[in-house]
Amino acid sequence: LTYFLRGEAQIGPKVRLWFVVSVILHSLYLVLLGVHLDHLPVGNLFQVLTSFAWLLVVVYLYLELRLKEMTMGVFLLPIVLLFHIVSTLLLNLDQPLATVLSDMLFEVHVAFIISAYAAFTISFITSTMYLLLSHEMHSKELGIFFQRLPSLEFFESISNQSINIGFVLIAIGFILGLEMGLELWEGQWYTEPKLLSVIAALVIYLIHIVTRRSMGWRGKRAAIISIIGFTWLFTSMTIVNLFFTRFHKFQ
C-alpha cells in the first residue's frame, strides 16, 4: 500500500523481499500442516482457503517478477490475507477426514479447481483495475490510478489470459469431480448445489470467451463479465459451503 500510494522506486525491492519471505513462510506452514494431517490440506473449506491463498500469492509473485509490475499487489494481498486469517481462526486440526477425501483423484480434482479460482481471481482484480483506470481516464481529473497503474491493454491482456487458463482448469476439475460424484450421488447430481454453482460459472466464463472472440466484446464489457463471474463464484461458493452442501461434505 505504501509503495502504491507513494510510488517510490526505492521501496520496491524491500516490499518484494518481505513478500518473498512471507511466501516462503506460508509454504513451510502448508508443508507442516500437510505432515500433521497426513494428506494435502484440501480436506475441508478452511484447509482449501489457506491452500488457495498460497497458490494465489505464488501466481501473483510469478506475474510480478515476469511483468515487473507491483501495483496489482495492493488489490490482491487483502484478499489473500482475509482467506488466510479466516482459515487460521476456524481450522480444526482434529476433524476426521472422510474416506473418499483420501482418494488421490479427489486431491487432483481440488488442485485443478483452486488453480482455476486463482486464475479467475487474477482476472477479477485486473478487470477491476481496468474499470478504475478507465473511469479515471474519462473523468476531468487524472488521479492516483492514472499515475500508478500501467495501460488498459496491460490489464485486459492479463484478464483475458487468466480466464482462458481458468476455464480449461475448471472444466478439467469439473469432469474429475463429476466422475467421482456420480458414484456417490447415485444419479442425483442435479441436487448438489456446488455442482450447479460450478456449471453456472462455466456458462458465465464461456459467455466471456465466446462474446470476446466472436462478437468483439472487449474492454469494459469483457471486464464486467469477468467481475460478474468472480462475484458469482465467491458468493455462491461461500453460501453453498456454509449452508447447503451435503455431498461435498460427505455426511
Question: What positions do the PLM features span?
Answer:
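Short, flexible active-site loop motifs that bind/organize anionic cofactors or intermediates
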Residues: 38, 101, 145, 186
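Juxtamembrane inter-helical linkers in multi-pass membrane proteins
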Residues: 137-153
